[in-house]
Amino acid sequence: MRFLILFLALSLGGIDAAPPVQSRIIGGFKCKKNSQPWHVAVLRSNKYICGGVLLDPNWVLTAAHCYGNDTSQHNVWLGKNKLFQREPSAQHRWVSKSFPHPDYNMSLLNDHIPHPEDKSNDLMLLRLSKPADITDAVKPIDLPTEEPKLGSTCLASGWGSITPTKYQIPNDLQCVFIKLLPNENCAKAYVHKVTDVMLCVGETGGGKGTCKGDSGGPLICDGVLHGITSWGSIPCAKPNAPGVFTKLIKFTSWIKDTMAKNP
């Protein structure tokens, strides 16, 4: 069955688009080839659902809301610059096990929760069935060792929608530069809870940010991985409505412990 699914994905030239999930890139630009070698495409069967980050040859980090009931169909593509085209640099791996953060509220996945929602702890580790081969196009990135600095210019990347209201995903991996803002900016913008395990990132004037399909992808601030795309405004990149990211410095112990206990 897995061979059949992989064959179908390859015969289609890569990957199908899935219905919108939660987050995407607006106002960005095509990333330079292989400039984000840790960026991963996370799939369910042959449907693209989220981004992810390679932390180790055996481990990918993504968002917990990318979780699906049938985890046996989770798989990833690494080393891709073009989502829907075959590339010599690309590597395919199945996911052997998923580890959503134990404190993430999984009932949020039903999308029938009264406001305000608390989307804290939105991260998930994926154990690969076979280690990734490290190449120029596939490289892990380290976890942060200190707090990010307010005002930093950060880089988000993803294959999420490039239009704010209509779900239109690009072939080329997109990058966007956005600012790390005080969490108060996001707390004022949303009815959902903004907690100390989240980062508020975007442009106060709007027009740039993440959107549907970018969920689980990396946020790099001053060259360091500091966040995972989590949630934001609808339509995306509205003025005074920055994006919200999982703050990884708060979760390094859980990430390292989970990886160590599941070699």
Curated annotation (Swiss-Prot):
EC number(s) recorded for this UniProt protein: 3.4.21.-
Q: How is its activity regulated?
A: Strongly inhibited by protease inhibitors diisopropyl fluorophosphate, phenylmethanesulfonyl fluoride and SBTI.
Asked if the record carries the keyword Hydrolase, the reply is: yes
Disulfide-bonded cysteine pairs: these are C31-C175, C50-C66, C154-C221, C186-C200, C211-C236
- Reply yes or no: does the keyword Glycoprotein apply: yes
To which protein family does this belong? Belongs to the peptidase S1 family. Kallikrein subfamily.
What name does the UniProt record give this protein? Kallikrein 1-related peptidase b27
